[in-house]
Design a protein with these regions (language model features):
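Acidic, low-complexity intrinsically disordered regions
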Residues: 1-280
Length: 280
């Protein structure tokens, strides 16, 4: 837990910030080489502050001010996932203003069923809908990605291999006893469908969309920048640089099989073993 303020010394502040960014990047790269599942959760919160606020060349008295502070949770992504399940962000006292997480790629647990929820082993048979599309459901456990609901449920954050495969919606599974956390509705266009392997992937985001507005580069005139943190952009960017080679956070692999007979009636989707995914 920290206010994460970088105290700017005399001289070139931009050079100072960049050097701290590089220091943080190198520190995380070193630890990632030791622990391949090392992940980071960054929580931005606010608290009341009364007293003198000191910076390099001055001070200001703050009374009943609201100032940001940060909680960093660093560790194995599986441990962090269990922590999030036991202590959801929504239950943190006084609330979390902003959140972002960096993690390494995972093959997440999932199962496939048709629209009625019917499956046979790892396979489901999908009947053609009236709009010319086949639809099936994917129940996935996305908790190990450590991403918030907004990120997971944004369909624009997902990649795919085939243009005729589309995620139509993503819903949170509310049942607390469920092993799976999210339900993906997937549609396949009848006119374009082929028997192919498919991979849906949750793409890594480089940095939080709130970061620029949370950052201050000057370290003075605190009253005018009450909701900003000096240098936070460079601290978080250092972490982002350490994780930039991880383009995907999660992947869901399956095979779409179109039988030679009765292709107008049904298509088949099934989970795929990683070993032969690209050979189908």
């Amino acid at each position: 837990m920290s206010d994460c303020i970088l105290d700017i010394p005399g001289g070139d502040a931009s050079k100072f910030f960049i050097n701290r960014q590089i220091d943080i990047q190198n520190a995380f790269i070193k630890q990632l080489n030791r622990c391949k599942d090392l992940s980071v959760e960054i929580l931005r919160l606010e608290s009341s502050f009364n007293g003198w606020y000191y910076y390099a060349h001055g001070k200001e008295f703050l009374k009943d001010a609201r100032r940001p502070y940060y909680i960093w949770v660093i560790g194995n992504k599986n441990h962090l996932s269990r922590l999030n399940k036991n202590v959801p962000l929504s239950e943190i006292q006084h609330g979390v203003k902003n959140y972002f997480a960096y993690s390494t790629p995972s093959e997440i647990p999932f199962e496939i069923a048709n629209k009625a929820g019917i499956k046979k082993g790892n396979t489901c048979i999908c009947n053609l809908d009236s709009d010319g599309k086949y639809r099936f459901l994917i129940k996935a456990n996305m908790s190990v990605t450590l991403q918030d609901e907004q990120t997971i449920c944004n369909m624009g954050n997902y990649g795919k291999l085939n243009s005729f495969v589309n995620i139509e919606r993503i819903d949170r599974i509310s049942a607390k006893e469920s092993f799976y956390t999210h339900l993906l509705t997937v549609a396949i266009d009848r006119e374009s469908v082929n028997s192919v392997g498919e991979k849906l992937s949750l793409v890594s985001l480089e940095k939080p969309d709130w970061l620029e507005n949370a950052n201050d580069n000057l370290g003075r005139e605190v009253i005018k920048n009450m909701d900003k943190t000096t240098g936070i952009k460079y601290i978080i960017q250092g972490v982002a640089d350490a994780y930039k080679s991880n383009k995907e956070l999660a992947e869901i692999k399956f095979v779409i099989s179109r039988p030679l007979k009765s292709t107008h009636l049904r298509d088949i989707a099934r989970k795929q073993c990683p070993a032969d995914f690209f050979n189908k």
